[in-house]
A protein has these predicted regions:
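A short acidic/basic microdomain associated with nuclease active sites
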Residues: 176-202, 208
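Catalytic cores of nucleic-acid endonucleases
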Residues: 222-273
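Active-site beta-strand-loop-beta-strand hairpin of nuclease catalytic cores
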Residues: 205-218
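Short, well-structured alpha-helical interface segments that form or flank functional binding sites
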Residues: 166, 170, 174, 204, ...
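Flexible internal linker/loop segments at domain or repeat junctions
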Residues: 200-201, 219, 231
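Domain-level recognition of nuclease-like catalytic cores that cleave nucleotide substrates
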Residues: 256-346
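Short, surface-exposed loop/turn motifs that are enriched in glycine and acidic residues
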Residues: 165, 169, 208, 223-230
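Interdomain/boundary linker segments immediately adjacent to catalytic/signaling cores
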Residues: 1-178, 327-346
């Protein structure tokens, strides 16, 4: 039976990210491991997937516990690209949402691959770039310490900016797809900003997730606190449900952290006053699981919820002391119990 064109397009899209020097291309070996991971997550047997057994077993069933190097470890019976496409088609025929599950996991994996390369290649700041900043602190400490402080904070700032960029391409689009919608940029948004007279303008508003079937406009938030944003930014958040209602859409607020705050209460009231809905904490996760359906709820619970929930635990605790060192071959970050080694390829 011929493989549907949509399956071939799905496989091709899953394989490549970006272009030029920034391109990430997944090998057959990596795609084999990712397909096997999806099948394991969804309890799809080999009789269905037609995938051979992995000759090098994963050290954990949890994707986040698997080193990126494992995906590149040669598997003795790795199928060809055409055989992998056939397996993908078989899995999609068995479970239609497998296509989205695999696509999202591949997107996550490619971004993680790309970010590791960024960490390895992000240039060390030069004194030509950062030297003038020493005027603000010069003389207060030894020159060597000040120079190190300038270098580290600039490099960390740079790699954090790159992390924000990569996450922006990943988090909201993946979350939106799990809910059966899509993230919409301001240029193509059906929600328009209102002027002072309450009339729509030509300027659109970004929507975290647009559900065209039910005409819902989602706003995702990890947490809403008094310190989360300035008054100007909060005014933007309060105007979102008003502008959604004016566009004929139902605004939906999803806040993953249940920590109460006056601003959260005010934001919920604004959504409610404009015919909107809100889901906070456990209700937010339950709503998303219900909306996602059986298969994509597994993706949410395995790949989205664990890192967000775990990191939220450390919101109000002081950061653990760490030691940073930079050698020719690596950057070493030491904590109290573990270390992070970043090979350098500059």
């Amino acid at each position: 039976m011929p493989i549907p064109i949509e399956i071939k397009k799905l496989f091709s899209a899953a394989r490549i990210l970006g272009s030029g020097d920034d391109r990430v291309t997944l090998s057959e070996n990596e795609l084999f491991c990712l397909l096997a991971q999806c099948c394991s997550d969804l309890s799809i047997q080999a009789a269905v997937s037609q995938l051979p057994s992995l000759s090098v077993l994963p050290p954990s069933a949890d994707y986040y516990r698997l080193p990126l190097a494992w995906f590149q470890t040669a598997q003795a019976d790795c199928p060809s690209a055409s055989a992998l496409v056939e397996s993908l088609a078989a899995c999609v025929a068995h479970e239609p949402d497998f296509s989205l599950y695999f696509s999202n996991l591949a997107a996550l994996h490619k971004r993680r691959r790309k970010y590791q390369r960024i960490l390895s290649t992000q240039p060390r700041p030069t004194m030509n770039q950062i030297g003038p900043r020493s005027l603000l602190e010069f003389g207060g400490v030894q020159h060597e310490l000040l120079a190190a402080w300038l270098v580290w904070r600039k490099w960390i700032f740079d790699v954090d900016n790159r992390a924000a960029q990569e996450t922006g391409y990943l988090f909201e689009p993946v979350l939106a797809s799990c809910l059966g919608g899509e993230a919409v940029g301001s240029r193509n948004s059906p929600v328009k900003r209102l002027n002072e007279q309450g009339q729509p303008t030509d300027e659109g508003r970004q929507i975290d997730c647009y559900d065209g079937e039910e005409q819902l406009a989602y706003e995702f938030k990890l947490r809403v606190t008094i310190a989360a944003s300035g008054q100007g930014r909060f005014g933007e958040e309060l105007s979102f449900p008003v502008e959604c209602r004016a566009a004929g859409l139902t605004p939906v607020l999803v806040v993953l952290d249940p920590t109460p705050s006056p601003r959260l209460t005010e934001l919920i009231a604004k959504f409610t006053a404009n015919g909107g809905r809100h889901y906070v904490g456990a209700d937010a996760w339950a709503h998303m699981d219900s909306k996602a359906g059986r298969t994509m709820a597994v993706f949410l619970e395995r790949y989205i919820r664990p890192p967000l929930t775990e990191m939220a635990i450390h919101e109000d605790t002081g950061p653990e002391p760490i030691q940073l060192s930079w050698s020719r071959d690596e950057i070493l970050i030491r904590g109290s119990n573990e270390s992070i080694r970043i090979p350098r390829r500059v």
